[in-house]
Amino acid sequence: MGASEQPPQRLARPADAPAISALMRASILALFPAFYDARYVESAARFIGELDMALIDDGTYYVHEAGGDIVACGGWSRRNRLYTGSGSSEDDGRLLDPATEPARVRAMFVRGDWTRRGLGRAILERCERDAAAEGFTTLALMATLPGEQLYRAYGFGELERTMVRLPDGVELEGVAMERPCAPS
């Protein structure tokens, strides 16, 4: 595959879960150290690198596969949960109202040796298109620092910088962001 070619994108399947989980952890361990110290990286790998199977079950999670390996993953949700890693709440599974609430961009990860090749952007484009087709007019996400540049380049605006408390008490700096969906 040439440097400018993207590996194909497809919907994630339940059988992909082990490979996706491994990619999430590997991506965190490779990319987070440039932004966070070791304690934060290990906590993020443990709690943020946890796959929410509802994304796959809902048909809103995508992967790019190259040579039989999943090299990028990400998706969106019509459910209330904004990110994995904060523990769960009763309201996480609530379906969002597309007329008044933003769809959630979730669990975006790219393998370290596949960054800067347009895979994250391709997943965001798919998320936006599919969410807009279901009536959503806005996308929201909680960015970790390694992903902030991608989201800004895609047109997400910062709502606020915040500290995300993980279940072990570690507080990880994040950025709440939103952008309008292009009309479908």
Predicted regions span which residues?
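Conserved acetyl-CoA pyrophosphate-binding loop and the N-cap/start of the following alpha-helix
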Residues: W114, G118-R126
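C-terminal "cap" of GNAT-fold acetyltransferases
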Residues: T137, M142-E148, Y154, E160-S184
